[in-house]
Amino acid sequence: MKFTTPISLISLFVSSALAAPTPENEARDAIPVSVSYDPRYDNAGTSMNDVSCSNGVNGLVTKWPTFGSVPGFARIGGAPTIPGWNSPNCGKCYKLQYEQNTIYVTAIDAAPGGFNIATSAMDQLTNGMAVELGRVQATYEEADPSHCASGV
């Protein structure tokens, strides 16, 4: 009996270690964020040269020359994850959730204070109340690019 107790304990520790969550399989928590709108993102003809994600290695202008060429237009805007020009986060897809509404937005510009998205996207997020609300507290997390249809 004395010999089986240490073996049982070793077996318990090994199985516990194998069942422990790893960073790869842990669920990411949504991050609180302020979301506002800017009608300039609703203009399909605006050149991508007018935003932080214009050119450079991570630029989007060669892929999408205008806002309207971004798949999922007008669910686009600035993101707090883009500090400025040529960010590696240019073109990433983000899930925004406000109350029971969820939208997916392609990041094309810098927005240090939170997400700043097209008015029509904000209307989708807030049930048509973008102008009335102006700014809302929501949550965000990076999403699979297929949700934004960006292919990034």
From Swiss-Prot:
Coiled coil spans: none
SUPFAM superfamilies named among the record's database cross-references: Barwin-like endoglucanases (SSF50685)
Cystine pairings recorded for this chain: 53-90, 93-148
Keywords: Allergen, Disulfide bond, Secreted, Signal
InterPro entries according to UniProt: Cerato-platanin, RlpA-like_sf
Pfam families to which the protein is assigned, alphabetical: Cerato-platanin (PF07249)
CDD domains recorded: DPBB_CEPL-like
GO cellular component terms listed in the entry, alphabetical order: extracellular region
Signal sequence, start to end: 1-19
Cellular location(s): Secreted
Protein family (similarity comment): Belongs to the cerato-platanin family.
Protein name, per record: Allergen Asp f 15
